[in-house]
Amino acid sequence: SDLWVQKMKTYFNRIDFDKDGAITRMDFESMAERFAKESEMKAEHAKVLMDSLTGVWDNFLTAVAGGKGIDETTFINSMKEMVKNPEAKSVVEGPLPLFFRAVDTNEDNNISRDEYGIFFGMLGLDKTMAPASFDAIDTNNDGLLSLEEFVIAGSDFFMNDGDSTNKVFWGPLV
């Protein structure tokens, strides 16, 4: 659907950190560096964050890239093929706990509104956009995102061809 393509373009736009038209390992490194700086995290946490975010590239996207950067068309076409595969859900969900760990800066196994705002800042978005996305994902309305809520919302973002509240998982659609 057009909505699904728009969601994939949104994800690509958020992850193409240097806006050079391709997703590369450098985008994930830059994201980790900005996040560590914005959240003023300790050096050991910054290392875990770097490992988590570069792990998304190393473990999941490098196969699509074939050792190079991934342009938007290649990314969208790869995702189209992936979501048709019944086993794709585990591949799509694989990086989500890594992102969760990156966003859960105080390591309490929940993401707070403030942490989600930092996440939006890390993606280069206005932090004031975060509450609407946070509320859409916080299905039990307890003011915290659990790993389960985060993974379900992230998986739905990629796998659901229709409209859902999780379409704003990575912020407003581009």
UniProtKB/Swiss-Prot annotation:
Post-translational modification N-acetylserine, affected residues: 1
Residue stretches making up the EF-hand domain: 3-38, 55-90, 91-126, 127-160
Positions contributing to Ca(2+) 2 binding: 104, 106, 108, 110, 115
GO MF annotations, alphabetized: calcium ion binding
Signal peptide start and end residues: none
Stored Gene3D superfamilies: EF-hand
Keywords per UniProt: Acetylation, Calcium, Metal-binding, Muscle protein, Repeat
Domain of life where this protein originates: Eukaryota
Positions of Ca(2+) 3 binding: 138, 140, 142, 149
Binding-site residues for Ca(2+) 1, renumbered to this chain: 16, 18, 20, 27
Record bears the keyword Metal-binding: yes
Keyword Acetylation part of the UniProt annotation: yes
Further comment found in the protein's record: The sarcoplasmic calcium-binding proteins are abundant in the muscle of arthropods, mollusks, annelids, and protochordates. This protein has three functional calcium-binding sites; potential site 2 has lost affinity for calcium.
Protein function: Like parvalbumins, SCPs seem to be more abundant in fast contracting muscles, but no functional relationship can be established from this distribution.
Listed name of the protein: Sarcoplasmic calcium-binding protein
Native species: Hediste diversicolor
